[in-house]
């Protein structure tokens, strides 16, 4: 039965019902009818530039483009008539007039839509005898991208991607008519961190990757489904290899995670991950020099060193939060159960990991009608997430409230931006929550804001609350209205200040009290009713006026900015708070987390869906997985706190190993203890403190002074060079296993490249080492370890984990034959 909001039409004799506003192209796709396109991309607005999707519609003249024509009731569409196919053939002939016959050398050959559609619809011979357009063949338009303008068919996908998706128009259309070409602005290269995506969406070989040019043919490549190991977003990728060598990475679209895009750091950076010499056999240091050893000798030496350290003193372990869940699980079990030490952590720390459990999914950004970013700038660390937030700002008009002391990639869209005192971020978040209550009180006077003695933390006096509800970091801009039309960090976006002033005018004394609360905590600010100060020194907030006191420096989160931000969030039905886990490294980290939870609860009051509305942004690829596997001093496997005695006993029983029920040293404490001569043994799993720890001197001193240092690593890093024993492990794209992204989604990795030499899977090494410390368990594959994780830790995300992807068989290797016929 047709729904009220649906339209019924007929395409090629088949009837279909689709929602109103659906494009003819999508309606045809619903029926499984293939309509060819070049310029269409479902993530961009339709353009109708290539004219390949022309169809015939009864009672309409001409051939309208299916990609830009909405359906209508009773519409009769034909996609396969003789007239339609003749039109497509003509369009292909037109596109091929200036297109060079580069197919034998073009990197796009074999996966080229123009090539494919020409074989299917196009003419077999060209009638064009005049000279074709000629351009420089190899034009380096950016560090990673090469442009061949002769091949370009002017579909404008690349231009629209940079302008509409990235919001950075680095590619433009130049000139007009038959002189039109794609190019960059003079003196400005295509250096966007998302530039590699233009090579994926280009339907011809006009835009190619510098690193992949002339390297391989698509039919010679083996493809392995995997996950990008660069950051915690967990973008899905296909690893393309040829004869065991990495060739390129391409996106494997997962709409709920990456929206089909990749950043250049992940796309190109991981191809050259081996920055140091590769370790392919076990090494034991004797007389200051590494000597090759057998696996049995190396494991025996590792066992001896760890036993001596455990017996004689203190033992600790540091793991990489880039490791797989399987490695981290076995590492934690070895340290906690086999070696009975509570001192384990990832180098960047997983102590905040429990805060992320049960958080919002990435897809929550799509339906959010208000977003708060707390010291978070995804373009810096979780890049693809930035594109999703940009899309919401551009397409839905979402104006995020940004709490940050730095310039961020989303500042241009901000409805309000609040700075904070570096040691008191929590106060700004609490003040924002109070501002939301104040704004709601204006819309509904019965809802009184909680200020003064009703501060977010119950039991505090009004004076104490006033002292804490502040964000007094100084800035270079005086508090006051702008004269150049530009918005400063702590001002509402243009068009909001007046509306907020009107909305807040006439509020109850509670609103004035909120401004008073904020003002009293900001040094140099005075609060007074309806009183003007010197020109350029006042800011109206409706019920109150806030001005800079005499001789005071300009301050950070001004009360009017906080109130403006509160107004933006007051009516949100699907509010979302996004914070970077680095806030937990601040002195008031836990207080900030509590304030964020309070803000989440406040936003959830108008939310009809009972889902989490906080998204935590971690730093490393598998930070959340590390916390869930218990590689943190205060966190048990399963992501539960060490204080959960019932769960502690259950894990201990499952493992059959006694554990110490105490909170151990974190990464900083472990390195300090080692540097102070208080540590007798240290196990480094795929981590390099010398290069990754903020204080290199402390890291070097720590590794130099520890009596026994064991390193499990794929590379001979500066830290590994200090080790007494090195166990060679698999590297990037050589291991199978799983990673947990920042939203808690467990995704599997496929082995794309064989492990070189005598190196082994990390989980295999840890299982072998664990057997020497009473953990009697053998594993045939990483999948078996994964099943144990699911059974033991009962994490919901693991229950539906499928089989690990396998690399598809490589094409049959052919002997290369020279022109003379010899091999």
Regions found by a protein language model. Give the residues of each.
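Fe-S ferredoxin-like electron-transfer domains
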Residues: 51-229, 233-237, 242-249
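Short beta-alpha connecting loops at secondary-structure transitions
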Residues: 9-10, 73-79, 182-187, 412-420, ...
């Amino acid at each position: 039965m047709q729904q009220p909001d649906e339209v019924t039409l007929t395409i090629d004799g088949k009837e279909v019902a689709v929602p109103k506003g659906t494009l003819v192209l999508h309606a045809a796709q619903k029926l499984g009818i293939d309509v060819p396109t070049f310029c269409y991309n479902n993530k961009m607005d339709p353009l109708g530039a290539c004219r390949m999707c022309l169809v015939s519609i009864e009672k309409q003249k001409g051939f309208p483009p299916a990609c830009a024509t909405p359906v209508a009731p009773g519409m009769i569409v034909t996609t396969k008539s003789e007239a339609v196919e003749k039109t497509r053939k003509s369009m292909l002939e037109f596109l091929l007039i200036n297109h060079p016959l580069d197919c034998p050398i073009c990197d796009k050959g074999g996966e080229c839509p123009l090539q494919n559609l020409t074989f299917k619809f196009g003419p077999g011979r060209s009638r064009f005898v005049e000279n074709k357009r000629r351009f420089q063949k190899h034009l380096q338009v950016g560090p990673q991208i090469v442009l061949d303008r002769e091949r370009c068919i002017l579909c404008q996908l690349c231009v629209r991607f940079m302008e509409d998706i990235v919001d950075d128009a680095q590619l433009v259309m130049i000139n007009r008519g038959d002189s039109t070409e794609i190019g960059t602005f003079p003196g400005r290269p295509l250096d966007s961190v998302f530039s590699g995506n233009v090579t994926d969406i280009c339907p011809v070989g006009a835009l190619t990757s510098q690193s992949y040019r002339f390297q391989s043919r698509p039919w010679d490549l083996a493809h392995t489904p995997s996950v990008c190991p660069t950051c915690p977003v967990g973008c899905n990728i296909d690893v393309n290899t040829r004869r065991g060598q990495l060739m390129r990475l391409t996106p494997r679209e997962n709409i709920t995670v990456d929206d089909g895009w990749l950043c250049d750091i992940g796309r190109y950076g991981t191809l050259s991950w081996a920055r140091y010499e590769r370790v392919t056999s076990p090494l034991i240091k004797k007389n200051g020099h590494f000597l090759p050893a057998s696996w049995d000798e190396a494991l025996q030496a590792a066992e001896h060193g760890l036993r001596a350290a455990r017996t004689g003193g203190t033992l600790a372990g540091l793991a990489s939060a880039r490791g797989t869940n399987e490695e981290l699980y076995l590492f934690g079990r070895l340290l906690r159960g086999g070696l009975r030490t509570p001192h384990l952590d990832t180098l960047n720390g997983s102590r905040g990991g429990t805060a992320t459990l049960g958080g919002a999914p990435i897809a929550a950004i799509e339906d959010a009608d208000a977003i708060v970013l707390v010291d978070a700038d995804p373009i810096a660390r979780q890049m693809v997430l930035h594109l999703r937030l940009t899309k919401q700002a551009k397409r839905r008009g979402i104006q995020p409230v940004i709490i940050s002391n730095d310039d961020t990639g989303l500042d241009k869209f901000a409805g309000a931006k609040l700075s904070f005192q570096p040691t008191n971020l929590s106060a700004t978040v609490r003040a924002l929550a109070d501002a939301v209550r104040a704004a709601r009180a204006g819309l509904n006077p019965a809802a009184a804001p909680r200020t003064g003695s009703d501060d977010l933390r119950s039991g505090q006096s009004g004076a104490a609350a006033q002292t804490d509800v502040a964000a007094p970091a100084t800035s270079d801009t005086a508090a006051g209205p702008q004269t150049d039309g530009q918005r400063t960090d702590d001002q509402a976006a243009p068009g909001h200040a007046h509306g907020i002033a009107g909305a807040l005018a006439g509020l109850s004394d509670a609103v004035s009290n909120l401004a008073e609360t904020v003002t009293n905590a900001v040094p140099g600010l005075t609060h007074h009713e309806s009183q003007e100060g010197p020109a350029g020194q006042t800011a109206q907030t409706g019920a109150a006026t806030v001005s800079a006191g005499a001789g005071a420096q300009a301050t950070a989160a001004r009360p009017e900015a906080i109130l403006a931000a509160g107004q933006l969030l007051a009516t949100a039905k699907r509010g979302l708070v996004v914070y970077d886990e680095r806030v937990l490294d601040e002195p008031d980290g836990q207080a900030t987390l509590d304030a964020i939870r309070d803000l989440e609860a406040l936003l959830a009051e108008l939310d009809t869906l009972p889902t989490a509305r906080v998204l935590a942004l971690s730093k490393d690829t598998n930070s959340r997985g590390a916390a869930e596997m218990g590689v943190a001093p205060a966190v048990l496997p399963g992501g539960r706190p060490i204080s959960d005695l019932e769960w502690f006993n259950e894990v201990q029983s499952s493992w059959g190993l006694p554990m110490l029920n105490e909170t151990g040293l974190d990464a900083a404490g472990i390195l300090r203890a080692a540097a102070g001569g208080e540590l007798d043994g240290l196990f480094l799993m795929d981590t390099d403190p010398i290069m990754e720890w903020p204080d290199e001197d402390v890291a070097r001193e720590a590794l130099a002074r520890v009596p026994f240092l064991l390193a499990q690593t794929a590379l001979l890093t500066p830290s590994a060079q200090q080790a007494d024993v090195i166990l060679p492990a698999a590297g990037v794209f050589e291991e199978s296993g799983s990673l947990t992204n920042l939203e808690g989604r467990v995704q599997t990795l496929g082995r794309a490249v064989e492990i070189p030499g005598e190196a082994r899977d990390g989980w295999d090494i840890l299982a072998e080492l664990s057997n020497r410390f009473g953990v009697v368990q053998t594993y045939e594959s990483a999948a078996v370890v994964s099943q144990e994780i699911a059974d033991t830790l009962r994490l919901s995300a693991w229950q539906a984990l499928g089989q690990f992807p396998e690399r598809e068989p490589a094409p049959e290797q052919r002997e290369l034959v020279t022109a003379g016929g010899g091999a």
